[in-house]
């Protein structure tokens, strides 16, 4: 079903069965598959391919040569009907690739809302990207990676499969991430190590002095006390009772499967 207010350039192919919302713009030389749904106001600039069982929300801007919903690169994948879901108001720049999920990983690759995926970003099968994240040029996510809200991933950074990147994290460019990065932390290097708290980013997002102090205290316990994670977890949990913002650390530890960067 194609809304009557949608524009489709004559050189583009929209297969029968695709759902195209109001005010959608599909520019020259695009291909949209039969199981694709594109929400109102989304723009495909030109030469965009959207394939597979893919749902794209409203008011997204998708630039030249982006590929969304194509078969993933997992060698176990045998054509199962897995999906891609993209939220609203994302900017997906040139040559970005977002691959469909696998049955082993839940069957869906997800991108939230208000994200910026810069040129050549790769989002592999079963990744989950939150809201208001920035992935700079040539950032590459392995399968099953989770990127929490407001995280910034520097250009040319590679993230190993199954890693979790916490909320408000900043990862410097050309880094290699092989373990999980706790919330609020700056990480840099190959292999990445912690470089303090993302103070400027937190200030811009309205964190008050008390919250910043509490986050610093948790960071010092985690990285400067000379103790193991299991040893400091109870103290961080106590700190979270007084300062709710610190609870983000506890929630993160519960999700972490690869250990945290050191």
Swiss-Prot record:
GO terms for biological process: lipid A biosynthetic process. It holds the Pfam family Acetyltransf_11. Keywords: Acyltransferase, Cytoplasm, Lipid A biosynthesis, Lipid biosynthesis, Lipid metabolism, Repeat, Transferase. Transmembrane segments: none annotated. Its EC number is 2.3.1.129. It is an enzyme of class 2 (transferase). It is found in: Cytoplasm. The keyword Transferase applies. Disulfide bonds: none annotated. GO terms for molecular function: acyl-[acyl-carrier-protein]-UDP-N-acetylglucosamine O-acyltransferase activity. It comes from the Bacteria. Pathway: Glycolipid biosynthesis; lipid IV(A) biosynthesis; lipid IV(A) from (3R)-3-hydroxytetradecanoyl-[acyl-carrier-protein] and UDP-N-acetyl-alpha-D-glucosamine: step 1/6. InterPro entries: Acetyltransf_C, Acetyltransf_C_sf, Hexapep, Hexapep_transf_CS, Lipid_A_LpxA, Trimer_LpxA-like_sf. Its main location: cytoplasm. It catalyses: a (3R)-hydroxyacyl-[ACP] + UDP-N-acetyl-alpha-D-glucosamine = a UDP-3-O-[(3R)-3-hydroxyacyl]-N-acetyl-alpha-D-glucosamine + holo-[ACP]. The keyword Cell cycle does not apply. One of its GO terms (cellular component) is cytoplasm. Signal peptide: none annotated. Involved in the biosynthesis of lipid A, a phosphorylated glycolipid that anchors the lipopolysaccharide to the outer membrane of the cell. Homotrimer. Belongs to the transferase hexapeptide repeat family. LpxA subfamily. This is Acyl-[acyl-carrier-protein]--UDP-N-acetylglucosamine O-acyltransferase. It comes from Yersinia pestis.
């Amino acid at each position: 079903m194609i809304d009557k207010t949608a524009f489709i350039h004559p050189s583009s192919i929209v297969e029968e069965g695709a759902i195209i919302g109001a005010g959608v713009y599909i520019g020259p030389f695009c291909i949209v598959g039969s199981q694709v749904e594109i929400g109102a106001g989304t723009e495909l600039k030109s030469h965009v391919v959207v394939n597979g069982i893919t749902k794209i929300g409203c008011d997204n801007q998708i630039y030249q040569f982006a590929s969304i919903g194509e078969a993933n690169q997992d060698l176990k994948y045998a054509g199962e009907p897995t999906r891609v879901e993209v939220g609203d108001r994302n900017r997906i720049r040139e040559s970005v690739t977002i691959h469909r999920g696998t049955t082993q990983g839940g069957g869906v690759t997800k991108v939230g809302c208000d994200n910026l995926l810069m040129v050549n970003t790769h989002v592999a099968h079963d990744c989950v990207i939150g809201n208001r994240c920035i992935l700079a040029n040539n950032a590459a996510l392995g399968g099953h990676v989770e990127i929490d809200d407001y995280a910034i991933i520097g250009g040319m950074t590679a993230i190993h499969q199954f890693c979790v990147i916490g909320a408000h994290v900043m990862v410097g460019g050309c880094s290699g991430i092989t373990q999980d990065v706790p919330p609020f932390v700056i990480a840099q290097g190959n292999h990445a190590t912690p470089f303090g708290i993302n103070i400027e980013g937190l200030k811009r997002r309205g964190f008050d002095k008390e919250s910043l102090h509490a986050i610093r205290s948790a960071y010092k316990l985690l990285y400067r006390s000379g103790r193991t994670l299991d040893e400091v977890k109870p103290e961080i949990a106590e700190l979270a009772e007084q300062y709710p913002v610190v609870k983000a650390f506890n929630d993160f530890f519960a999700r972490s499967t690869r250990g945290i960067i050191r």
